[in-house]
Amino acid sequence: MDAFEVLALKGTRKVLELLKTKDRMRYSELVSAIGFSTTTSRALKAMVAARLVDREGLDEPYRPVAYSLTEKGRKLSQLAAEIGKL
């Protein structure tokens, strides 16, 4: 799946917008902000596979996971914002 296909998935643009505002966010923070755990999970898996987002396991109890934008993800986020202005 390429970046444009991932961008078309429900929830992807919201995840990009949220991650653009913070260096990294835990999965639970993303779910709380977006409100759709299944949608968020699918979007994140596709974004990690497309190398738009890095997934990092945190060394804490309950093995939480955090996500952050890659350089490619930052560029796509900027492009999506510009397209949204049209």
Question: What feature does the model see in each segment?
Answer:
Residues 59-80:
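Basic, amphipathic "hinge/linker" alpha-helix immediately C-terminal to the N-terminal HTH DNA-binding motif
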Residues 26-28, 45, 65:
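Residues within the helices of the helix-turn-helix
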Residues 23, 51-52:
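Glycine-centered, phosphate/nucleic-acid-interacting loop/turn motifs that mediate DNA/RNA or nucleotide
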Residues 1-39:
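N-terminal helix-turn-helix DNA-binding core of bacterial DNA-binding proteins
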Residues 2, 14, 43, 64, ...:
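Amphipathic alpha-helical recognition patches that constitute DNA-binding helices
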Residues 4, 77-84:
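Hydrophobic alpha-helical core bundles mediating ligand binding, dimerization, or RNAP-core interactions
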Residues 34-49, 55:
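Short amphipathic alpha-helical interaction segments
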